[in-house]
Amino acid sequence: MSDLDIQIPTAFDPFSEANAGDSGAAAGSKDYVHVRIQQRNGRKSLTTVQGLKKEFSYNKILKDLKKEFCCNGTVVQDPELGQVIQLQGDQRKNVSNFLVQAGIVKKEHIKIHGF
C-alpha cells in the first residue's frame, strides 16, 4: 500500500503558461506580449501585461493606459518575469488595441489569456 500514486493539489500559478515554453524555444517565446486577467475577490479582477521590450518606458505606457481607460494601475518588478504592468478591471481587449494602435507591438505578437 505504500505505492499509491496520489497527486496533491497545488496553488494556481497564472504565469505558468509563460514559463512552460522557456525550455524549448527561448527566442520565440520572448517575442510575445502576454495580456492576462486574474480574479481578485468577488467581481474584482486584475489585468497584467508582460513581455514588453525593456527599452520602452513602462511608467509612460502605464500613465497613458490609466488615462485612456480611467483605471488605476502599477508597474511591478517580478524576479522571474521582469517588469509587469498591472491594471484594475478587465482591460484585455482595450490594452491589446492600445498597444497595436500606438505601434508598440504588432497584433500577431499579442497573446490574450484568461476566461
Curated annotation (Swiss-Prot):
Signal peptide, first to last residue: none
The UniProt record lists the keyword Protein biosynthesis: yes
Record keyword Protein biosynthesis present: yes
GO molecular function: translation initiation factor activity
Keywords: Protein biosynthesis, Translation regulation
Protein name: Protein translation factor SUI1 homolog
Function field: Probably involved in translation.
GO biological process: regulation of translation
Organism listed in the record: Sporobolus stapfianus (Ressurection grass)
Entries under InterPro entries matching the protein: SUI1, SUI1_dom_sf, SUI1_euk
Name of a matching Pfam family: SUI1
UniProt record similarity statement: Belongs to the SUI1 family.
